[in-house]
Amino acid sequence: MIKAYYPLLTNTTYLNTAYVGLMSNQLAEFRRSHEEFYLKNGGDQYKMKAYDDLDSMHQHFASFFGLTSDRCFGTSNFSAGIRTALSFLPKKMKVLLIEEDYPSLTDAFKEEGFDSAKIAMQSQIEDAIKEKLKSEKFEVLALSIVQYTSGLLIDQEYLFRLKKEYPSLIIIGDGTQFLGAHPFHFDKSPFDLVAGSGYKWLLGGFGNGIVMLSKDFVAMTSQKVESIRERFFNGHFNILGMASLDFAIRELFQNDFQSLVKEKAALSEEAKNQLIADEFLPQWVGERTFHSSIFNISGGQELFTFLQKNNIRCVQRGSGVRVSFHFYNTEKDLKKLLRTLRSFRELNSHLPFN
């Protein structure tokens, strides 16, 4: 049933949600009617209604992500949201980052003038973080919950243990490749700040995102939540983008999001096992307890072109080709990917795959 909501899936194998999530028929119709109101009633009525709707929208966001509405903030995208949030932190704080992490995350700290150090991305990244924290003092750890190139999923249980060992450590997560793809309850997580865009796994279209702050983070700012909200909503906001995210989240609620991500997780686990068995993925992917539904397959431009010719949507990332599975994907999509990869390998036996 879910697949029928997305017209592109009738003629395309779409394995590119990690790049851009699909738009449903329902969201497209909502956006048309939303802008029709603007056209027929004028910008003044359109803007006043948007501000009237803000509280209810944030209540929906808070309910979905597991926190109170006064500590979540709609924003135009991850990049804008993280920079606004970082403006509340003292610049003297030392930050630990990961090399090859999402550039807009690492650049945000550089732009704000924070003292930072980086560790190399590696398959057992949690061990590397632990060793670095032992050797140097850091006030902030910032990382993507899912690494956008490889699909590595950070172990949140490890982050809980880290919090216990370093209770004053502020943990910041880029959730763009995580939110909407995995179950998440912010107030039961180890994070003090999570920000993400809504156009990928949340399927909210362009022009929206979310920022979530822990009670400890808010207390550390010595600001009232009203003052924090004013900074996030300084000037006008993306009215259509915010309304679209609200609509998308209500749709996820209505379609039983928890069941959808369970189905996605099962398909992703099957994809991981098959891709490893066929030696299309490096061994470290199978050695970790958990992985996301994003996979990076070696093959470069030749493989990318071959997949495109076979009507499989994907994207080049790093030295490989990245594919990703969402809940609107099916086992049929996985079988087509595997069949196409095997055909490519037969035709290009000289190329390495892992």
Model-based region annotation:
Residues 1-4, 306-354:
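PLP-dependent enzyme catalytic core of the Aspartate aminotransferase-like
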Residues 45-46, 229-272:
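Structural signature of PLP-dependent enzymes
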Residues 189-224:
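Active-site PLP attachment segment
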Residues 124-176:
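Active-site phosphate-binding strand-loop segment of PLP-dependent enzymes
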Residues 50-93, 103-105:
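Conserved beta-loop-alpha segment that forms the PLP phosphate-binding cup at the N-terminus of a helix
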Residues 80, 84-140:
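PLP-dependent aminotransferase-like
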Residues 265, 269, 278-310, 317, ...:
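Conserved PLP-binding catalytic core of the aspartate aminotransferase-like
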Residues 11-58:
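A glycine-/small-polar-enriched, mobile loop at the entrance of the PLP active site in fold-type I
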